[in-house]
Amino acid sequence: AENWPRFVLPSPALGIADRIRRHTAAGRPVWLYGHNMGGGFAVAVQEQAAAGLAPAASPDAALALHDNPERVKAQGVSITPSCPKGYAAVPLADYEPGFWDGLLSAAGLPKPSLVVAAAQDHGHHPEGNRVGRFNLWRALLTETQGDPARWLYDTSPTPCTRLNALQQCTGGPVADTATAAVLGALAAPEVAKRSQRQGVTVVNVGNSHVAAFLVFKGRILGVYEHHTGMLDTDALLFDLKEFGFGWLPDEQVRAKGGHGCAFLAPLPPEAEGFAPTFAVGPRREMLLGYAQFIAPHGDM
C-alpha cells in the first residue's frame, strides 16, 4: 500500500522525559499530574531522584510508573494530590487534544470527527506488569473466542487503566498496540486469503516486545508475547515453531523472561502448524528470510 499520509512523531513519553531532564538540569523538582500513560519517562524521573531533587506525582500519574504505590515511593517519588511549593508541574497524557488541535491547525487540516487510538496496556496488577498483561491476553482470547473484531473496544475494560485514561482523552475506540498490529495484518489481502486456507502466524516485532498470533479462518487461536531484547533470531524462531504446534508451555516463556503464551485448545490439525509467517514492526529484520514482511495501509 502506498500514499497513506501520516504524522510520525516522537512518543509523548519522550517529550515528557525531555521536560523532566530540563527541570533537573535547572535544579527544579517536578510534580507529575494528569493521566496514566506510557512510562517511557521513568528513567528521567529516576535521574531526578538520584540528583536529590525528590520528584513527586499525583495518585493517577503515579500509575504510569507502577501500579503499586510502594514501588513508586521506592523509586524516590512521593505521592501527593497537589503540587508542592517550588515544584514544576508536568502534565501526563498519551493524547493531549490541545497539542493535536494545534498541529492539525498549523497544517491546515480540520479536527477529526473520530479519534481511534492504541496503546500498550498491562492492566492494573500491583504484583507486576508481566503477570497483569498476560492475564489480560488470556481473558481476551477466551471471552471473545478469538474474534479479533471484539478486540477493538468501544469502552475499554476496567482493568485496562492506561486505555481507560486514553479513552477519557480521545472519546473514541481504543485498542492495544499488539491488537492494532494483528488487525492491520488481517487487513492485508495476502494474509486474509492465506489464513482462510491454512493457519498463519502474525508477528509484531516491536522495539520492546514481540507479540505473535496464530490466525485461522478469521479467528485468533493463540497469543505469545516476549521482550525483544531477550531474544535473538534463533530463540524467536524456536519459540514460534513450538508455538505454532501448540507445544510451547506458558511456564517456559515466563521462565525465560517473557510474558507468556496461551491457546484456544485444541488447535485444529488443518491449520498445519501455522507455518506461513507474516512480520510487521520496527524490529522485523530479526525474521529476515524467515517471514514475509508486510506493510498494512503503508505501515510496517
Q: What does each model-found stretch correspond to?
A:
Residues 112, 209, 219-221, 274:
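A broad structural signal for short, well-ordered beta-strand segments within beta-sheet-rich domains
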Residues 1, 195-217:
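Gly/Thr-rich phosphate-binding beta-strand-loop-beta motif of the actin/hexokinase/Hsp70
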Residues 213-245, 252:
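A beta-strand-loop signature enriched in Asp, Gly, Thr, and Trp
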Residues 2-200, 226-233, 246, 253-300:
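Nucleotide/phosphate-binding catalytic cleft detector across ATP-hydrolyzing
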